[in-house]
Amino acid sequence: MKTFTAKPETVKRDWFVVDAAGQTLGRLATEIASRLRGKHKPEYTPHVDTGDYIVVINAEQIRVTGAKTTDKMYYSHSGFPGGIKSINFEKLIAKAPERVIETAVKGMLPKNPLGRDMYRKLKVYAGAAHPHTAQQPQELKI
């Protein structure tokens, strides 16, 4: 019997909506990253993007454990000398709540062109409203 490998043109992708309200950041991000890769499907193939589309709502209500609210730092660098910037979780969740989940999930995906394609299937929104109702996303309990 031959080993099955998925073809990019035959992959069926579903849409799922995840409510992040009250969820722990890391536990939610690992499940989302796994589903973006397609590891929950029997036809998973490492070199083919077999994952689903994930819409995350209520990103502003995500939580972290311990003192990470004030201690967890996010860094960015402009590329110029002395160009490092840092912001803590508390300020970032107030400024751009979507970036918290996006950063966590992006770090869990492969760092190559396939990983970038997987990341594009993640849609994160701060509130409960999202513009993807036409895709009829199914609710995903995590």
Curated annotation (Swiss-Prot):
Single GO MF annotation:
structural constituent of ribosome
Keyword line:
Ribonucleoprotein, Ribosomal protein
Is Acyltransferase a UniProt keyword of this protein? Answer: no
* Key word Ribonucleoprotein present: yes
Report the Gene3D superfamilies cross-referenced here: Ribosomal protein L13
GO CC entries: cytosolic large ribosomal subunit
Q: Which domain of life is it from?
A: Bacteria
The GO annotation for biological process reads: negative regulation of translation; translation
Q: Which family does it belong to?
A: Belongs to the universal ribosomal protein uL13 family.
| Task of the protein | This protein is one of the early assembly proteins of the 50S ribosomal subunit, although it is not seen to bind rRNA by itself. It is important during the early stages of 50S assembly.
PANTHER family according to UniProt: LARGE RIBOSOMAL SUBUNIT PROTEIN UL13M (PTHR11545:SF2), RIBOSOMAL PROTEIN L13 (PTHR11545)
Q: How does it assemble?
A: Part of the 50S ribosomal subunit.
What is the name listed in the Swiss-Prot or TrEMBL entry for this protein? Large ribosomal subunit protein uL13
Organism (species): Pseudomonas fluorescens (strain Pf0-1)
